[in-house]
């Protein structure tokens, strides 16, 4: 019966366990799209309510969306981004505004 250790085969080489490579989950940008009907005040309200922005930051993002057609509200994990998109779109519909929120991989 052999007296070899579990860590080698007797040829001077030791086995080393490979460290699993952990890949970070992809992040997603949540974006608002400009339209000609949603009041600017409502967009600021949405940014403060769902993205935790203060009034100054929300106004800056709203103006960016208004002038460029689209603006990033935040970057989140997929589940959080999907939830925020659904919440914003539902809130806009409940208030009879056509504001549209989307997401894409960052």
UniProtKB/Swiss-Prot annotation:
InterPro entries associated with the record: ClpS, ClpS_core, Ribosomal_bL12_C/ClpS-like
Domain of life: Bacteria
Any Gene Ontology biological process: proteolysis
Free-text function comment from the UniProt entry: Involved in the modulation of the specificity of the ClpAP-mediated ATP-dependent protein degradation.
HAMAP family hit by this protein: ClpS (MF_00302)
Similarity section: Belongs to the ClpS family.
Subunit composition and interactions: Binds to the N-terminal domain of the chaperone ClpA.
Classification via PANTHER family: ATP-DEPENDENT CLP PROTEASE ADAPTER PROTEIN CLPS, ATP-DEPENDENT CLP PROTEASE ADAPTER PROTEIN CLPS1, CHLOROPLASTIC
Protein name: ATP-dependent Clp protease adapter protein ClpS
Gene expressing this chain: clpS
């Amino acid at each position: 019966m052999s007296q070899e250790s579990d860590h080698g085969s007797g040829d001077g080489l030791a086995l080393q366990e490979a460290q699993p490579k952990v890949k970070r989950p992809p992040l997603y940008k949540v974006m608002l799209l400009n339209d000609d009907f949603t009041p600017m005040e409502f967009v600021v309200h949405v940014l403060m309510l769902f993205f935790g922005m203060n009034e100054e930051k929300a106004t800056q993002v709203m103006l960016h969306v208004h002038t460029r057609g689209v603006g990033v509200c935040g970057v989140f994990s997929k589940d959080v981004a999907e939830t925020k998109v659904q919440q914003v779109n539902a809130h806009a519909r409940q208030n009879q505004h056509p504001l549209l929120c989307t997401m894409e991989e960052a």
